[in-house]
Swiss-Prot record:
DNA-dependent RNA polymerase catalyzes the transcription of DNA into RNA using the four ribonucleoside triphosphates as substrates. It comes from the Bacteria. This is DNA-directed RNA polymerase subunit beta'. GO terms for cellular component: DNA-directed RNA polymerase complex. Binds 1 Mg(2+) ion per subunit. Binds 1 Zn(2+) ion per subunit; 2 are expected compared to other organisms.
Length: 1412
């Protein structure tokens, strides 16, 4: 669709826009947009408050203030008269008054006809001046044979009338073409020109006399004090020169317009290309010519601008404004305040200045004022228009308010957080929404949220009004609205009715990842706070200390269905970051389950036998048996499914029988805290706890070891196994095929149809799923049968209506997908119930002092005294004394901790110990502060970059520890000492949160357009993975098992005996991964995102498993956004503190935190600390020698590497190492390119220069994983791979061959491959380039979409380059589609496969006759 969008843009549907292009607006375009000229600076009349005619708010130009009212005669019309002309009066006809709604004031534009040409500010100020690059003006100064390039500053002076330029020499030798005449040299230049001109005329002639007089006057002025200070009269001299010769000298936008008019773009292009070829030859001859490289880069930039104009076919003169558009009135409102005062948008003030100056210029011109006055007025007009376009970028003379605040210009309204892109296009305010404080809702089911009645009444108002009118409770909308406002009791039944099958979406800010927005079924509550299910709080990172959440309501049937199928809390059980459940019980629930699962030897009722589960419960209620007593039940009472094959009696505690009763009958029985792989360990456990008939139970139980109760980690493992067993395996369509074949006569015996179905892996359904599906189907059919019988008898052979089948399908589908959540709800209820019954409380007597504390403290004090003695004798330095003291106190605190651990080991009845051991709250570190010693405190000393580079000791820890515990009480000095650490902790957290949020934003912009778009890209280029090992500590950071699980293999995997363990092209599940690792295989080649062939996207096989669903990723999944969120969300947990490591600000401290992560992702060239030296060759370390120099500060080592050249000759390379750097190699070691020779961070560009992209990819992956794993955060490789792929997605061209690429230009790697493929197929010379690494800050700016790039940063620069090249945005990514109001090309709007999670068809469609 190539329709040009002009005044008729309102008629074009936004959904029909397929691509967007920018171009320079011509004066004719502006007139076409405009409804009239604004020629008066007034806004509104101070008496009537009505807009002034011809002013900035004129109703005739910008539209009426009142709907369908004539702005001339004031007559009112109906909506049907819209867009017609008012002909009520003669004046109406003359003025052409149009009948419009007041919405017209949001899109009707005006214009100001400028009385002088004005150069658009962006084109000479942004990105080193587009005008300067395009004109590329050069001048031959004097006798010089090398031309001088006119700088952008000189051109700016020209635009602002500070200097003049020679446009035509007229054959005068004293005037060089394009010479800028500055005030300092003007006198001499003009004098020489006039002397040259006078020779053309005979002496005594009128012209000769006039010129002689001018030369005499000029000589007098230049020699006078005034002339030296203020310069000559340019304008008079220009007129004389133009009158008596064909030379032409001018200034301002007129001069630029003349130059732009004369420029021959194609000739300029040829000249630049010829100059480039010459520079390139010189560079090839001598690679070290830096100045030539800089010259080449400047020429390329110029060529880029010239080509942009040639390819877009635009006239460069259009950069000059003749008609200035005036934006619609309601986009720059004027608001009335109290006391007849007004507040106005800054734009109005800027427009007012332009109109005043423009009108004044018009008057001066009409009055034939002196040229100098007119030129000054033109300069002021140029400055006024500049201020309107971009006031912030003006280096001087910014237009400010009385208070000195710079006015907000149109550019400022586009850029930044509060600009159009980020505030209004990417982040809009949403209708049908509200917010309130959250409180816990312990009685809610997992898919429910408590919505306050008052909020529901407002949010669902339109539906409630419809219901009230339909049921004749009110007669009009107005009455219904009043009833809702007054909270009339009549409305509440209707509120309850309308919220059925209407999900709500809850969002908690900051929205760090997709689990911060989830959907729920609303349950009305009478309070004013939203009730939240306790298990979903982890996803939202919410607590109940005053947190607020926003509520949103999906309205359309499609939105409701999408919300229910994709956003309900029961679909968000696994965290996308690592694929582990995020809904694990915590705090009270953990404490209750810990208490419930405790075992106690010799408890009341131990060894009792009960014939039924109910009998045991009754005995427990009558207190004849304790909760922790081990009792016996018949096996068939506990596990009837297994009892068919196994008989006997089962031993466990009353609590564990209660706990296991909530799990489905076919789930393994939980005996103890050994819950890893319950299915596999089940047979061995059953032998131990299932006794044959006739056994002496009491005697057997007395000899049985007491098991540990379930703690938080064990419960999390159980939740994972519940998910793996009961997560839905079928698609909705599969269940629909069964329902379609059932009727009331056969539904009980034909549920066997489920056995014929196959799950997403093409395997038979497991027994738990078959039994549950049968149970749900029989129950729902019987419920429907009873419901229909109420209206009369129902025949058994009656065929169900389509809508009845759809209703059944929805209910069965919900129950089937809710199996995991229903078990989790039971666990939650049990946890809360028994934490209450446990009676856990805290008393000061629960805190037991560390037995050997004082011995340890005494030992520490003696050690410190010795250190002080050594220091006083000069045996150690002050820094050494400090470091040793810190190390000693750290060790003492650890000793006290170990002592405390031993003392509380068997104290299971202590409430504090129970909380700690269960994982409900607190840990041993908190307990040490309570009962041992507080230990070392942080100081607010900041480690600087220079400290890291010089390995200085930074005293970021208070040397004297807090020896008291909280139980003993702190001394006043200790209390004061601990305040520093508390403040540092708070400030660090605040700073870290902001930095982490900015990191997430950058990452989202880097990867936003990466979506899974295909099944397979058929790449044969794999990625070899092995254990990621930290070479310094020799520990495994990420094991091979984690790296291959859920990924596709690129090659077959064989064990040492040659037996195939897994085939190429198959996905590695957990069992296969364990098999591969058990076989001792160290390296596996997998399919990777880093080698996927799909442009700007990824295929299913290169991505592998979707961690959030635990199955193969679906086409349409926005994996780029998920990757950015998964890396950014835990960013706040990454510590920025270095004090905990012992006070020395060395490289090791710095490399472990947030700072290093930013360095890697932004590809910093100057990282913290001394960068590591790396080997540039394959070779051997032959010598490491001391570097002895006179200056002691420069001591160090020389490492000699012996390597072979390309001619197979031996050569040596010597690398200098500073003494403070730690060596990682020794003589005789073999080294490879990119290998570290000393400790320190590697600079990414250096690594890429000596090795290849794959080495850099591995380094980045390892380093980023190391940073997160050091903090105990696990992130999947694939997310980091997506970001790394984007960082290495650009190629810098070094030879352009027969392509259209420029040497030195940066192009997308996929475009590079595509163009080269075409050239090779045509037997032409391909281009050659090097892969370059770009940081997260630069990648979004290099995007193919100017909308996405402009909404990120450097908006004006991106837009300027897009305009001059008429760049086309094909709307392929996510951001650009949101900006233009389209659905994003992902999820349910993508080309998803049938039966995938995005296939959310209307359930009726499965039963429609034409669908069969």
């Amino acid at each position: 669709m190539n329709t040009k969008v002009s005044r008729q843009y309102a008629k074009i549907s936004e959904n029909s826009i397929q691509k967007i292009s920018l171009a320079l607006a011509t004066p004719e375009d502006v007139l076409e947009w405009s409804r009239g000229e604004v020629h008066r600076p007034e806004t509104i009349n101070y008496k009537t408050f009505k807009p002034e005619r011809g002013g900035l708010f004129d109703e005739l130009i910008f539209g009426p203030l009142v709907d369908y009212k004539c702005s001339v005669c004031g007559r009112k019309y109906r909506k049907s008269n819209e867009n017609q002309l008012c002909i009520a009066t003669k004046e109406c006809k003359i003025r052409g008054s149009r009948i419009l709604s007041k919405m017209a004031r949001r899109y009707s534009m005006g214009h100001i006809a400028l009385n002088a040409p004005i150069l658009h500010f962006w084109f000479f100020k942004i990105d080193h001046s587009i005008i300067a690059k395009l004109l590329g003006l050069k001048v031959f100064e004097g006798n010089s044979k090398v031309p001088t390039t006119i700088t952008k500053t000189a051109i700016e002076n020209l635009i602002y009338y500070k200097s003049h330029i020679v446009l035509e020499t007229g054959g005068l030798k004293s005037l060089e073409q394009n010479k800028i005449i500055d005030i300092s040299e003007a006198g001499l230049i003009y004098k020489n020109a006039l002397i040259e001109i006078i020779e053309f005329y005979p002496p005594g002639s009128e012209e000769h006399n006039a010129l002689a007089e001018s030369i005499s006057e000029l000589a007098d002025v230049t020699s006078s004090k005034i002339g030296r200070e203020y310069g000559v009269d340019y304008y008079e001299l220009n007129e004389i020169i133009e009158e008596f010769s064909s030379a032409r000298i001018a200034t301002g936008a007129l001069a630029i317009e003349y130059l732009l008019d004369k420029i021959d773009l194609r000739a300029e292009k040829a000249a630049v290309e010829a100059e480039l070829a010459g520079v390139q030859k010189q560079i090839y001859k001598n690679k070290k010519i830096i100045l030539k490289n800089q010259k080449r880069d400047k020429l390329y930039k110029r060529l880029q601008v010239i080509n942009a104009f040639i390819n877009s076919g635009q006239d460069p003169k259009m950069m000059i404004i003749r008609n200035l558009p005036v934006i619609p009135a309601d986009l720059r409102p004027l608001v009335q305040l109290d006391g007849s005062r007004h507040s106005t948008s800054d734009c109005n003030e800027l427009y007012r200045r332009i109109i005043i100056r423009n009108n004044r210029l018009k008057r001066w011109k009409a009055a034939h004022a002196p040229v100098i006055i007119i030129q000054n007025e033109m300069r002021m007009l140029q400055e006024a228009v500049d201020a309107l376009i971009d006031n912030q970028k003006k280096s001087t003379n910014q237009v400010t308010t009385k208070e000195g605040r710079p006015l907000k210009s149109i550019s400022d309204a586009l850029t930044g957080k509060k600009g159009r892109f980020r505030q209004n296009l990417l982040g809009k305010r949403v209708d049908y929404s509200g917010r309130s404080v959250i409180v816990v809702g312990p009685k809610l089911k997992m898919h429910q949220a408590g919505l306050p009645r008052k909020m529901a009444a407002v949010l669902f108002e339109p539906w409630i009004i419809r219901n009230l009118i339909q049921e004749k409770k009110v007669g009009s909308i107005k009455m219904a609205r009043k009833m809702i406002e007054e909270e009339n009791p009549i409305i509440w039944p209707h509120v309850a009715k309308v919220i059925q099958n209407k999900p709500i979406i809850l969002n908690r800010a900051p929205t760090l990842h997709r689990l911060s927005i989830q959907a729920f079924e609303p349950v009305l509550v009478r309070a004013k706070a939203i009730q939240l299910h306790p298990l979903v709080t982890a996803g939202f990172n919410a607590d109940f200390d005053g947190d607020q959440m926003a509520v949103h309501i999906p309205i359309s049937p499609e939105a409701i269905r999408e919300t229910q199928e994709l956003m309900f809390a029961d679909k968000n059980i696994l965290g996308p970051k690592d694929g582990e459940p995020i809904v694990n019980p915590s705090q009270d629930m953990v404490l209750g389950l810990y208490y419930l699962s405790q075992e106690k030897a010799g408890a009341k009722g131990e060894g009792s036998f009960f014939s039924t589960y109910e009998a045991m419960l009754k005995a427990y209620e009558f207190r004849s048996v304790e909760l922790h007593a081990r009792v016996v039940l018949p096996f068939e009472q506990v596990k009837p499914f297994i009892a068919k094959t196994m008989r006997g009696h089962l031993i466990s505690t009353v609590g564990k029988f209660i706990l296991n009763n909530i799990f489905p009958a076919n789930f393994p029985f939980i005996f103890d805290d050994n819950v890893d792989e319950l299915e596999l360990n089940y047979p061995s456990q059953i032998k131990k706890y299932v006794l044959p008939y006739g056994t002496n139970f009491r005697e057997y139980i007395q000899n049985l070891k007491v098991n540990e109760p379930l703690n938080k980690k064990a419960i999390a493992k159980i939740v994972r196994q519940i998910f793996d067993t009961y997560d839905g395996l079928l698609a909705k369509e599969d269940i629909a095929t069964v329902i379609d074949q059932l009727d009331f006569g056969n539904y009980q015996n034909r549920v066997l149809l489920y056995e014929k179905l196959r799950d997403y892996k093409k395997q038979k359904l497991p027994v738990p799923h078959l039994s549950k599906l049968s149970e749900f189907t029989i129950f729902e059919y019987s419920q429907l049968y009873k419901q229909l019988q109420q209206n009369g008898p129902v025949e058994s052979y009656r065929v169900l209506e389509d809508h009845e089948k759809a209703e059944l399908l929805e209910k069965i589908w919900f129950k089937y997908n809710n199996m995991v959540c229903s078990i989790l709800d039971k666990i939650k209820d049990l946890g809360f119930h028994y934490s209450t019954l446990s009676g856990t409380s805290i008393a000061i007597s629960d805190i037991k002092m560390a037995p050997k504390k004082h011995e340890f403290i005494k030992d520490g004090e003696n050690y410190i005294n010795k250190l002080n003695t050594f220091y006083a004798k000069g045996l150690i330095t002050d820094d050494e004394r400090y470091v040793l003291a810190i190390a000693k106190w750290t060790q003492i605190k650890n000793d006290i901790q170990e002592d405390l651990n031993q003392s509380i080991k068997d104290d299971n009845q202590n409430s504090l110990v129970m909380m700690m051991k269960s994982g409900a709250r607190g840990n041993i570190s908190n307990f040490v502060q309570l009962a041992g010693m507080r230990g070392l405190m942080a100081n607010n000393v900041k480690a600087l970059k220079v400290d890291a580079e010089n390995e200085r000791v930074v005293r970021s820890i208070v040397e004297v520890p807090v020896k008291s515990s909280f139980l003993e009480g702190l001394t006043s000095f200790e209390f004061y000492s601990s305040t520093h650490g508390a403040r540092k902790g708070l400030t660090d957290t605040a700073l870290n949160t902001a930095k982490s949020g900015y990191l997430t934003r950058r990452l989202v912009d880097v990867a936003q357009n990466i979506v899974v778009v295909a099944e397979d890209c058929f790449s044969d280029f794999g990625f070899v993975v092995k254990d990621i090992i930290d070479t310094k500590t020799n520990t495994i950071i990420v094991p091979l098992l984690e790296r291959i699980e859920g990924r596709f293999l690129n090659k077959d995997v064989y064990d040492s005996r040659g037996i195939k363990l897994a085939s190429a092209g198959s996905m590695v599940d957990l069992q296969t991964a364990k098999k591969i690792v058990a076989a001792g295989i160290k390296k596996v080649e997998i399919r990777s995102i880093l080698s996927c062939h799909i442009k700007n996207s990824v295929c299913k096989k290169c991505y592998g498993k979707d961690l959030a669903t635990n199955r193969l990723v679906s086409i349409g999944e926005a994996v780029g956004i998920i990757a950015a969120q998964s890396i950014g969300e835990p960013g706040t947990q990454l510590t920025m503190r270095t004090f905990h490591t012992g006070g020395v600000a060395n490289v090791e401290d710095i490399t472990g935190g947030f700072t290093r992560l930013i360095e890697l992702i932004d590809s910093h060239e100057h990282p913290w600390g001394k960068p590591a030296k790396i080997s540039p060759y394959y070779g051997i370390i032959t010598k490491i020698s001391d570097l002895a120099e006179k200056n002691a500060a420069n001591k160090g080592f020389l490492i000699t590497i012996e390597y072979k050249t390309s001619k197979n000759e031996k050569a040596e390379h010597i690398i200098r190492i500073e003494q403070s750097q730690k060596l990682r190699v020794k003589v005789g070691d073999k080294v490879i390119p990119g290998q570290k020779l000393v400790e320190g961070p590697i600079i990414l560009k250096e690594l890429l220069a000596v090795s290849d992209a794959r080495t850099l990819q591995n380094y980045l992956l390892k380093e980023i994983q190391r940073i997160y794993r050091m903090q105990g955060i696990s992130i999947s490789d694939k997310y980091i791979e997506i970001i790394i792929r984007q960082m290495l997605s650009k190629v810098q061209i070094i030879e352009n061959g027969d392509s259209n690429f420029f040497i030195g230009s940066i192009v997308d790697i996929s475009d590079y491959q595509e163009v080269n493929g075409q050239l090779i197929s045509q037997n032409k010379n391909p281009a050659f380039g090097n892969v370059i690494v770009k940081g997260a800050k630069q990648i979004p700016l290099l995007s193919n979409s100017f909308l996405a790039a402009a909404s990120y940063q450097e908006t004006s620069k991106i837009l300027v380059h897009s305009v001059i090249s008429s760049q086309i945005d094909k709307l392929e990514g996510l951001k650009e589609n949101i900006i233009v109001g389209h659905k994003i090309p992902a999820g349910t709007n993508s080309n998803y496969e049938p039966k995938s999670k995005f296939d959310i068809r209307n359930p009726l469609s499965f039963f429609m006759k034409n669908n069969r």
